[in-house]
């Protein structure tokens, strides 16, 4: 059996000088699945699983980054994730990797316990959430993205039909740049309140009647949906910029209806 010479110094290849002198904007690890806990709006701790992407900028003269340090960062951060802890993670990553710029992104399922509108039965509904942050030149920007499933009902179908109207499930995706902490539930509420109707995991017959009639009384085109949500985001000072999408999975077509609004309040006229 070979034994390592105590005097042997293991070479640090990635720290050597690269003669090609080409900088790399982003290098790191992608799709790292790792346990995660998050704080809910009520202060409860919710366990989930995050899919992480972590990267830094690599100078032209440096051959490689320290890949193991990205995973080590996740191992060191087991406390429930908050906006401030996430900001601190970015700063810690830059320090560990001796980098001037970097980015962290984590996507995870987030569950909300919802109460049916009539029967009062409770059930969980899942939402896809992404928290992202990037730092460069000492400036850190934070982004919260939420995909919210809702119901939409067509105003034209209601207007021209003797009875009924076509309706479908829709996705509202809000990708907001934050100036202050915004709970995930706050963005979910905005999307659900501006849709024809929200969704629940479990409904009894009286609830189904309510949902059907609620959507019928609140018809919206995909254009209406994004504009109404955008108005709510415009009024929220905690959000400085956003990309907002709505997609209706049309029940009478084999395609979707789609709309997007992008706005940066810092550059608004």
From Swiss-Prot:
Its EC number is 3.5.4.16. One of its GO terms (molecular function) is GTP cyclohydrolase I activity. GO terms for biological process: tetrahydrofolate biosynthetic process. It comes from the Bacteria. Pfam families: GCHY-1. Keywords: Hydrolase. Pathway: Cofactor biosynthesis; 7,8-dihydroneopterin triphosphate biosynthesis; 7,8-dihydroneopterin triphosphate from GTP: step 1/1. It is an enzyme of class 3 (hydrolase). The keyword Hydrolase applies. InterPro entries: GTP_cyclohydrolase_FolE2, GTP_cyclohydrolase_FolE2/MptA. Belongs to the GTP cyclohydrolase IV family. Converts GTP to 7,8-dihydroneopterin triphosphate. This is GTP cyclohydrolase FolE2.
């Amino acid at each position: 059996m070979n034994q390592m010479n105590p005097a042997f110094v293991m070479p640090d290849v990635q720290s050597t000088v690269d003669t090609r002198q080409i900088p790399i904007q982003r290098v790191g690890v992608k799709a790292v699945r790792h346990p995660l806990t998050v704080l809910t709006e009520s202060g409860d701790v919710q366990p989930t699983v995050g899919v992480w992407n972590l990267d830094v900028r690599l100078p032209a003269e440096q051959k490689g980054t320290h890949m193991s340090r990205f995973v080590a960062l996740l191992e060191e951060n087991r406390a429930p994730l908050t906006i401030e802890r996430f900001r601190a993670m970015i700063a810690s990553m830059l320090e560990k990797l001796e980098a001037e710029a970097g980015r962290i992104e984590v996507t995870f399922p987030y569950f909300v316990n919802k109460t049916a509108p009539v029967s009062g039965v409770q059930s969980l509904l899942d939402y896809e959430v992404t928290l992202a942050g990037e730092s460069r030149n000492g400036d850190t920007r934070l982004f919260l993205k939420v995909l919210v499933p809702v119901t939409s009902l067509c105003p034209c179908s209601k207007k021209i039909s003797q009875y009924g109207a076509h309706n479908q499930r829709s996705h509202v995706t809000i990708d907001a740049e934050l100036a202050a902490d915004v709970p995930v539930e706050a963005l979910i509420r905005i999307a659900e309140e501006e849709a024809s109707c929200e969704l629940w995991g479990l409904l009894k017959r009286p609830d189904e009647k309510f949902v059907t009639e609620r959507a019928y009384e609140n018809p919206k085109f995909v254009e209406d949906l994004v504009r109404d949500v955008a108005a709510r985001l415009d009024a929220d000072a905690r959000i400085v910029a956003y990309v907002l999408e709505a997609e209706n999975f049309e029940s009478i077509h084999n395609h979707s209806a789609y709309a997007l609004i992008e706005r940066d309040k810092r550059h608004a006229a």
